[in-house]
């Protein structure tokens, strides 16, 4: 039985963009435990192509993120071809990868919160070293500290500079994580359900920050099940279901009642107000 919903015939996959590839997956398969969680996933995201990967819990979103960040590895192809490339490369040192592709995930937040006595400034500085603390043997320069203040100001979190990281609210944490992801001036940001746990005001601040970053030329790759996070600048939408791509097309084609109802397995109603989308179940 094919899991591909009927609306796939409606969606028109976007043509390849003549830009350097940000992410390339070629028949990527991932097994976690004894379960195959990604099935022959083929996907190309170009630099400058803001993209949202959308789907229900268990559709493979977290496995996709861990595949890109090299926390999971794909099965080897029998023909020796490469299954995953990021910025054109298939071999990365983790610290170099994360300096080019900023990462904002819930796992990262939890790891930082577990560091005793960590301040916001130290949390953001740790982004320079792809670690959860500032290594004792590494020098922190004045330029680094200035860049920390710059990115915190961009996300509206500069007043938090000397606060303890573990004391922050969910909204404050998200602003600090985005600032941390920006310290190395990455070409792109990978955002994992960034509005989870945020109140209405914090969510609106997050949306405004995302739009600012998109306008500055930072490519956004959003992984979520909240369509409210899909800002207008994100034109490409990839729907995931059961570890496979169910549809790949434009936001106008896919962020609608029918496609979302099919991929989420129940009736979904999409309402648009002043350019903002909201989804309701039932």
Question: Which residues are covered by each model-predicted region?
Answer:
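Conserved catalytic motifs of ABC-family nucleotide-binding domains
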Residues: 185
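Conserved ABC ATPase signature
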Residues: 138, 164-168, 172
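Catalytic Walker B motif of ABC-type/P-loop ATPase nucleotide-binding domains
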Residues: 189-193
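Conserved ABC ATPase "signature" region
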Residues: 125, 139-160
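H-loop/switch region of ABC-family ATPase nucleotide-binding domains
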Residues: 224-225
């Amino acid at each position: 039985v094919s899991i591909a919903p009927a609306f796939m015939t409606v969606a028109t996959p976007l043509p390849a963009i003549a830009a350097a590839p940000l992410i390339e997956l070629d028949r990527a398969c991932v097994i976690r435990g004894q379960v195959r969680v990604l099935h022959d996933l083929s996907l190309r995201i170009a630099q400058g192509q803001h993209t949202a990967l959308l789907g229900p819990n268990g559709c493979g979103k977290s496995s996709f993120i861990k595949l890109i960040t090299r926390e999971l590895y794909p099965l080897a192809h029998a023909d020796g071809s490469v299954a995953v490339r990021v910025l054109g490369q298939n071999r990365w040192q983790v610290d170099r990868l994360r300096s080019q592709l900023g990462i904002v995930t819930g796992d990262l937040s939890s790891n930082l919160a577990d560091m005793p006595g960590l301040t916001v400034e130290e949390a953001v500085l740790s982004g320079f070293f792809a670690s959860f603390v500032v290594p004792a043997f590494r020098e922190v320069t004045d330029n680094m500290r200035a860049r920390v203040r710059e990115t915190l100001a961009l996300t509206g979190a500069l007043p938090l500079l000397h606060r303890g990281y573990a004391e922050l609210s969910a909204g404050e944490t998200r602003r600090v994580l985005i600032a941390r992801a920006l310290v190395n001036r990455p070409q792109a940001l990978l955002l994992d359900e960034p509005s989870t746990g945020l109140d209405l005001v914090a969510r609106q601040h997050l949306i405004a920050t995302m739009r600012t970053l998109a306008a500055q030329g930072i490519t956004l790759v959003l992984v979520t099940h909240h369509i409210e996070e899909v800002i207008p600048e994100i034109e490409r939408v990839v729907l995931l279901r059961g570890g496979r791509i169910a549809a790949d097309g434009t936001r106008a084609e896919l962020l609608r009642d029918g496609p979302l109802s099919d991929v989420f397995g129940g009736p979904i109603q999409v309402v648009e107000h002043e350019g903002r989308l909201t989804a309701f179940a039932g």
